Amino acid sequence: MIKLTRRQIIRRTAGTLFALSPIASAVAKTVRAPQFTAARIWPSHTYTRLTLESTAALKYQHFTLDNPGRLVVDIQNANINTVLHGLSQKVMADDPFIRSIRAGQNTPTTVRLVIDLKQPTHAQVFALPPVGGFKNRLVVDLYPHGMDADDPMMALLNGSLNKTLRGSPEADLAQNTTPQPGRGRNGRRPVIMLDPGHGGEDPGAISPGGLQEKHVVLSIARETKNQLEALGYNVFMTRNEDVFIPLGVRVAKGRARRADVFVSIHADAFTSPSARGTGVYMLNTKGATSSAAKFLEQTQNNADAVGGVPTSGNRNVDTALLDMTQTATLRDSRKLGKLVLEELGRLNHLHKGRVDEANFAVLRAPDMPSILVETAFLSNPAEEKLLGSESFRRQCAQSIASGVQRYINTSVLKRG
C-alpha cells in the first residue's frame, strides 16, 4: 500500500472538491465561453432577422411555444453580457414579427432568448462562419407562417429554388391603373424587375465618408421605378426596404414575374480611389473579361456569404438552366446593356466604352435579359459626392429608365 503524506492528502482532496464543484465548473467554462460582441435586428415586411455576433461559434437549440406565441433560443456554453442586456431596446415598434425580446442566464452555462411574436411565424435559425468584417454569427430569421409555397424566398427555405418559377402577374396587371404604353401582339404590358443590390446585414460598399451602397442603390431604384411606371410599364423590385435578399431569390423573383427586363443596380468600390466611372455588365458564364470585372464579380457574388444564407438553401439558379434559350437571352442582354450604357454615358464618365462581362450570380437567368449597372464608385472621392447627391441619383434613374424604354420599344414590343 502506498502511504501519502498529510500535505499530499490535502492537495488531492482540494483538487477533487474543486473539480466537482458546480461553481468551479462554471468558472472554467466561463473562461472558454464565446463573448457576444454585437446584436442587430433587421425588421422588414418580407422577414425579420436577428443577428448575434460572437468571438467563437455558438452551440444552440430552439423551440416554439404557443398562447402566446414565442420562439425560444438556448445558447450553450455562453454567458449574458451588456450586448444581450441591450437587445430588448433594439426591437422596433413597427416590427411585423417581434413584439419583444428577453434575454437571461437560464443556467450557469446557458443563455436563453425568448422572442415574443406578433404573429405565427416560420423560424430559421442557423450559424455563419466569419466573413468580411463579421465574426461568427448566429442568425434567427422570422418569416410569415402562411407564406405562399411558390414565393421565391420560401422556395429557398424549402431547397427548391432551382425549379423553374413562373408567377401569374395578370392579376397585378389588372389592378395597375397607370397609363398604357404600346403592347405586344399578345396584349401583355412589358414587365421590368429592378434589383437594388445588397441590403440588411449586407451594406455593400461603404465610402470613406460612411455612405452605404445599399441605401444609395435603393434610392436610385425607387426613382427608376417611378420613371418607368410613369411610362406605363409594370415595374417590380426585388426589395423596397432595408432587407437582405439572397442572390438566387432575386433572380427567381424576376422569373416568377416573367420579367422582360432585369436590372441590378449597384454603386461599388475598388481597391484604388482613382477608379471611377459608370459601367454596365452582362453575364459571361466563363468568367470576367477584365480585371475590374473580375474584382466586382468576386465582391458581388460574395453577397450571400456576407448577408447570410442557410446552407440548406439553393443560393443560385441552377447553372444547368443556363443552357435553355441562353444564346437569345445573352444577345438581348447585350442590346439592353448597350442602350442603358449610352444613356448613362451622357451623365457620367464611362469606366469602359462597351458592355463588360462577368459571371455575376444575380444575372444567371436563362430566359430573362439581365444587366448589372455600376452607377459610380463610392471609393472615388468625387463620385462619392455625386452618389450622395439626390440630383445625381435622380439623373441616374432617368438614364436607366430611358435605356430600358429604348430596349422595350425596339425589342420587346416588336416581338409581341
From Swiss-Prot:
The alphabetized list of GO BP terms reads:
cell wall organization; FtsZ-dependent cytokinesis; peptidoglycan catabolic process
What's the EC number here?
3.5.1.28
Q: Main location per UniProt?
A: periplasm
Q: Does the keyword Signal apply?
A: yes
Q: Pinpoint the MurNAc-LAA domain residues.
A: 192-405
Q: Please provide an example of a Pfam family that matches this protein in its UniProt record.
A: AMIN
| UniProt-recorded name of the protein | N-acetylmuramoyl-L-alanine amidase AmiC
Q: Which organism is it from?
A: Neisseria meningitidis serogroup B (strain ATCC BAA-335 / MC58)
